[in-house]
Amino acid sequence: MAGGAREVLTLQLGHFAGFVGAHWWNQQDAALGQATDSKEPLGELCPDVLYRTGRTLHGQETYTPRLILMDLKGSLSSLKEEGGLYRDKQLDAAIAWQGKLTTHKEELYPKNPYLQDFLSAEGVLSSDGVWRVKSIPNGKGSPPLTTATTPKPLIPTEASIRVWSDFLRVHLHPRSICMIQKYNHDGEAGRLEAFGQGESVLKEPKYQEELEDRLHFYVEECDYLQGFQILCDLHDGFSGVGAKAAELLQDEYSGRGIITWGLLPGPYHRGEAQRNIYRLLNTAFGLVHLTAHSSLVCPLSLGGSLGLRPEPPVNFPYLHYDATLPFHCSAILATALDTVTVPYRLCSSPVSMVHLADMLSFCGKKVVTAGAIIPFPLAPGQSLPDSLMQFGGATPWTPLSACGEPSGTRCFAQSVVLRGIDRACHTSQLTPGTPPPSALHACTTGEEVLAQYLQQQQPGVMSSSRLLLTPCRVAPPYPHLFSSCGPPGMVLDGSPKGAAVESIPVFGALCSSSSLHQTLEALARDLTKLDLRRWASFMDAGVEHDDIAELLQELQSLAQCYQDGDSLVD
């Protein structure tokens, strides 16, 4: 198993999932571009887990994400549904019909200035109508992504970002994008707002068959499919789309891993009553149904709460972000996702999605929380033991699952990844004869330092840890959020304004936590307070009163799994 690619197929369902996915694929693409850099560690992460090789109509080799994404009409902006990599304008222009023609032209969206710069750096449109790509990596350590001939940085402005396709710099396969034409992305009418609407989409033969055809296309070319990762909006009707997609995957591909990342955008406000009630109902239905059909489910949000009461967004000591901008929030969540998914993307690891889920989800605990330190605060001259000791006994991670602060909660099992720390900093370089200031300073390898630290933090808890040299890529179009970091991602007291940060160290974790007991119970309590007669429109979308009663029972049963005291070490 360790020697093969162990392919993963990614499903992106929803518009905020598109934002997170765009940053995620940009980061994978940036990592591919560094594959031949002599400073980069080789062979830690296997890009073939996420990417597939192919050929254009003109025989040029391509390397594109193994991806199916679903979004609503009007969400693509200037991006073509079939992508641009395989398109042949000569074939588009070939018309066999000899009779009278009437031409209808749809007004094109203006292309984002950032994407215009990006495409000019990536290749040229030749006179014969064929797109000539300068260089596309093939996943085997071949040439990196082509850069522009001028040093002009390709940095989009926040004002220019309307939709996720405005900053996606990765070419997609024609089988990737699936648009739901019956609902609109913009405007107040025709929105995909409710869980029942989303379920109904994949009950329609048209969309179900389209999804199944795309699944078969990607799955049949895999040598060893380890499973599926679903990036799914929880706050709107895509929670229902995700639930039906997970159910389909469970039925069709039994035994494969299904890890679902339930995504929620930034803060919300009390004044938006209907939107908040719908968000609560969609989140609750989504969590319960996705848990039933997934190997593992993890909510991801920078918000402080899943419930009706607004809480301030989480704070990162070394980041300055705007929680109202999906472009910022999704970048941070994608960085965490790029780190916590490392275990099933390693070249040398036998860990699969199923193994990771089994370790974290014992005793029915299929919902986990995520946390991360972005960036990991290693200052110049510090060692890893020095930096870890600064955290003291507190849980170091910023919570990313809207479950409140983790202090005082119990962890039942955890998977931890620390990446981007130079090997020379892994251990303390003490002068011979100097007594080590802590047990961490006495460790002889970085892996030992990390394992010892986790044992001190959570004695007796089942922990899996990974230490990687490979950092997380945050080059443009990633937003400039790192005001306290130098170019290598090191934390500085006062970095020069505008310093270019292209990679950072990140400390990320997935945890089966007792905090979920309180979070899920609070979600159930908020639901019991609702007067459903006021929200008949949600019920009209295909949800019955009996479904609400069953939902409450399932939420409370799930919450009981996380009562403190129920763990492997008891």
Swiss-Prot record:
Subcellular location field: Mitochondrion outer membrane; Cytoplasm
Cystine crosslinks: none
Record-linked Gene3D superfamilies: Tubulin/FtsZ, GTPase domain
SUPFAM superfamilies in alphabetical order: Tubulin nucleotide-binding domain-like (SSF52490)
InterPro entries: DML1/Misato (IPR049942), DML1/Misato_tubulin (IPR029209), Misato_II_tubulin-like (IPR019605), Tubulin/FtsZ_GTPase_sf (IPR036525)
Keywords for this protein: Cytoplasm, Membrane, Mitochondrion, Mitochondrion outer membrane, Phosphoprotein
Taxonomy, superkingdom: Eukaryota
Residues bearing PTM Phosphoserine: 495
A Pfam short name: Tubulin_3
Single GO biological process annotation from the record: mitochondrion organization
Cellular component per GO, a single term: mitochondrial outer membrane
Protein role: Involved in the regulation of mitochondrial distribution and morphology. Required for mitochondrial fusion and mitochondrial network formation.
Family: Belongs to the misato family.
PANTHER family named in the record: MITOCHONDRIAL DISTRIBUTION REGULATOR MISATO, PROTEIN MISATO HOMOLOG 1
Protein name: Protein misato homolog 1
Organism: Pongo pygmaeus (Bornean orangutan)
Taxonomic lineage from the root: Eukaryota, Metazoa, Chordata, Craniata, Vertebrata
